[in-house]
Every structure is written in structure tokens, then in C-alpha cells.
Amino acid sequence: MEDILLYFSLKYHGQFDLIYKALERKERVDESLKKELFATIKCSYTTIISDDYPQHLKFINCPPFVLYYYGSLSLLDNECIGVIGKRDCSEYGVKATRILVEDLVKQGLVIVSGMAKGIDGVGHRTALKSNGHTVAVLGSGIDYPYPPMNKELYDQLKNELIISEYPGLTPPRKDYFPKRNRIIAGLSQKLLVTEADIKSGTMITVGFALEQGKDVFAVPGRIYDSKGCNSLIQQGAKLVMSVEDILEE
């Protein structure tokens, strides 16, 4: 059955809906195509019925049938916190992220983010610089580092853990990033937003985290730069001024 899940994931480029429909209608496996597709795999992978599949993900909406990865899935056995925010972040957002991530990894927490430009990249780099651990969840194929500016970071993160539900060189699509965010939320026991706009991918991730019953933390910001964080705090997110505000929960 694992081979069947892998086959349809490769054939349909990791798209949950297409894989689901193929399984539902009991689509036949083309053995010749299967052999061809399997030969393209460069990374490790796990399926939803495998023993090493991340347990937390089994309980989210539309859990990926297959996860492709580089690095060690055992990182997910530790307490994980999602650290997310704006792509076009301010110096304040960068500083807040660095300080909080440094303190979080000192406490043994693993930083989960999306390797995007801005806050995501700051979170990953700070974790690495602080001798901590970090997990990247991609919105592109596992062998397609995106954005290109983070290629060097991608290479470093291969020694930590990089995950994608999209195989090989599947290029990013606009709708892949919101879907990626459900995995970030699913792998994280807590979610920290350090800077955000009201309408953003960050807020989509927050929605997934709340749907999954996770605690959401937000760093307050200026009304011009971080309306999303301030709005979250108004709605009940836990205000963060130091790492203690997160660890106490």
C-alpha cells in the first residue's frame, strides 16, 4: 500500500485532492510508469501508513499521503514551535524574531517555519547560528529550493529537516503555500507570530493552528507594521514580550 500511495503522489505531484480521487476510484497502477516515477526519487520519504510518519499530522485536515524529506524526522520528537511572519519584515520584526528564537532553542525547542523570505528565513538562520534545530516545510517540490535567494539556507537545512508533500522538482504554485501552512501548524505544538499583516499567509497558518487547538502567541508591534499581530492579540492570542511568556503556557 505504501508503494501505491507513493505512486499516486508522484503521478499527481503531491496534490492531495487528485491523489484522494485516484484512490477513491481505485485507479489502476501503470507498472511501467511506476518504475519510471520511482527512479526519479532522490530523497527519503514516508507515507501516512508508515511507522515513522509524524503522528501529529495524522489528525489535521487533509493530512499529506506522502511526505518527502531530507534530514532526520526524529527532530519532530522534540517540542516544536512554529515561528512565522511577514516576508517584507521590519528591523523590529527581525530583532524580535532573533531574540525569541535564540531563547527558544536554548530551552530545547525546535523551530518550524516555511523557508520563505523575511521572518521565516530569520527564524531558521537564527536557530542554526544558535546551535539549535529547525525544520523547513516547503511550498514547492522537495528538490526545488524556493525562493532562490534561500538556496544556501536550503543546503544547510538538509542537515536538519526539510519536508514537502510535493515531490522532486515540482515548481511552486500560489495555492501550494496556504496548503503548506497546514503542515507547519500541524507539526508545531505552539505557534509564534513575530510580525504580520492582517491579510497574509501568516494569518492562514494561524487559522490552521486554531482549528487544530494550538496555542497562538504574538509579538505586539507598531500599528503601521504589524496590524496582524495586534489584531491577534485583540482576539485572544497571548501577547509575547519575552520567551517566558511562551514557556509559561
Predicted regions and their residues:
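Short, small/acidic-rich helices and loops at N termini and domain boundaries
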Residues: 1-52
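Glycine-biased, small-residue-rich flexible motifs in mid-sequence functional cores and linkers
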Residues: 48-249
